[in-house]
């Protein structure tokens, strides 16, 4: 399996950002890390091994990006406004740096984005906010309400980065149609700590007539990383 490490000084993040690339061709797949994870997390947790066939056969080229939650939502050394500000910088990094880099590496315009837990939140949020840039999102064991990380702080920035809120109140038919064009998959398993949160997000999407697929696997586990890579593999096609 071809594996390449890339790193550059990110103007958006104000620091060096690492990236691991697996494979050399196929549909681009961006993988966000979970809480306190980094660009190596998917490989360390068996996710890349689970995708070995897709990568080696040229079905997917995988891009594992660096941490966002540890410096933003989970950083309680800074206030909620600063947490969201840091996350906004991360979104800018994805849109203004990562996507142009991927387009130079891979001519396929179809972009899949995925993540586990808070990584699933990031993946879904990016697809909802930028539905013309991402064609498919696979949320794995995700939760989609970031108010749990905001210390009861509420403002417009929280609102527009919180899918359970801004999607619920979105009435612009043009934007809703663009979002409906995204292939949305939300997956979880029976005893997952985020199963209810995934169901809530699915219910909101249905209320807005946004077509998507939502599955709860009939399996139990004490470790979502035991199941999430298998879910991802089954939903890439």
Region roles according to the model:
Residues 1-237:
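Non-catalytic cap/lid and distal C-terminal segments of serine-dependent acyl enzymes
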């Amino acid at each position: 399996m071809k594996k390449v490490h890339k790193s550059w000084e990110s103007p958006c993040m104000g620091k060096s950002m690492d990236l691991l690339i697996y494979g050399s061709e196929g549909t681009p797949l961006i993988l966000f890390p979970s809480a306190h994870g980094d660009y190596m997390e998917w490989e360390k947790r068996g996710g890349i091994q689970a995708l070995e066939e897709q990568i080696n056969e040229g079905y997917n080229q995988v891009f594992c990006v660096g941490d966002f939650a540890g410096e933003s939502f989970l950083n309680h050394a800074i206030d909620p406004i600063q947490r969201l500000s840091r996350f906004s910088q991360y979104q800018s990094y994805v849109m203004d740096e990562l996507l142009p880099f991927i387009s130079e590496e891979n001519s396929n315009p179809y972009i899949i984005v995925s993540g586990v837990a808070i990584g699933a939140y990031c993946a879904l949020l990016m697809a909802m906010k930028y539905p013309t840039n991402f064609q498919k999102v696979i949320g794995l064991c995700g939760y989609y309400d970031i108010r749990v990380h905001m210390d009861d702080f509420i403002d417009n920035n929280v609102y527009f980065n919180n899918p359970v809120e801004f999607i619920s109140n979105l009435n612009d038919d043009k934007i809703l149609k663009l979002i409906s064009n995204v292939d949305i998959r939300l997956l979880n398993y029976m005893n997952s700590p985020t199963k209810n949160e995934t169901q809530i997000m699915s219910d909101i999407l249905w209320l807005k007539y946004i077509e998507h697929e939502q599955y709860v696997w009939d399996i139990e586990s004490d470790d979502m990383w035991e199941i999430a890579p298998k879910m991802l593999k089954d939903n890439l096609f």
